[in-house]
Amino acid sequence: MLLLSCNLEEDDLKSLLETGASVNAPPDPQEQSPAHLAAGGGLACFLLWQLQTGADLNQQDVLGETPLHKAAKVGSLDCLSLLVASDVQIGVCNKNGQTAEDLAWSYGFPECARFLTMIKCMQTARSSGEQQERDPRAPVLRQKRSFRTVESGVMKRKC
């Protein structure tokens, strides 16, 4: 049933865009693109269609918010996942200096906030790993570090 309703909404919105408006054109005074509206409404199916038609998922509205901010404000983990999988920039701040992660926490969506925190950590680790690969000392940096715990005397890897 959800797919049916998404398809109907998608068809309606698709016909609006087929009238000649750009997929990234802000349709309202708030400068929200169709991707902003889809993410803010938690409509992952329409957001996916926006992706397939070339929407700029990093476009900011008058508040400086991207579709990622909108999805975080409504707690749409589906939209957040789709946006992150599309390599959206997660560190963008709105005009109040808030990231999507900050908004998820402040709007009471801890699951979404933890998801964005995890993605941010993974991206940081990935970029750190890429820097190490370019570093001539990389083999030394990749060696495991261990320490002996006082209680057990067992060697453990230290993260």
UniProtKB/Swiss-Prot annotation:
It is found in: Nucleus; Cytoplasm. Ubiquitinated by the CRL2(FEM1B) complex, leading to its degradation. ANK repeats lie at residues 1-25, 30-59, 63-92. Expressed testis, ovary, uterus, kidney, liver, but not in other tissues. The keyword Aminoacyl-tRNA synthetase does not apply. Its main location: nucleus. InterPro entries: Ank_Repeat/CDKN_Inhibitor (IPR050776), Ankyrin_rpt (IPR002110), Ankyrin_rpt-contain_sf (IPR036770). A motif (Nuclear localization signal) lies at residues 130-150. One of its GO terms (cellular component) is cytosol. Keywords: ANK repeat, Cytoplasm, Nucleus, Repeat, Ubl conjugation. PANTHER family: ANK_REP_REGION DOMAIN-CONTAINING PROTEIN (PTHR24201), ANKYRIN REPEAT DOMAIN-CONTAINING PROTEIN 37 (PTHR24201:SF0). This is Ankyrin repeat domain-containing protein 37. It comes from Mus musculus. The lineage of its organism: Eukaryota, Metazoa, Chordata, Craniata, Vertebrata. The gene is Ankrd37.
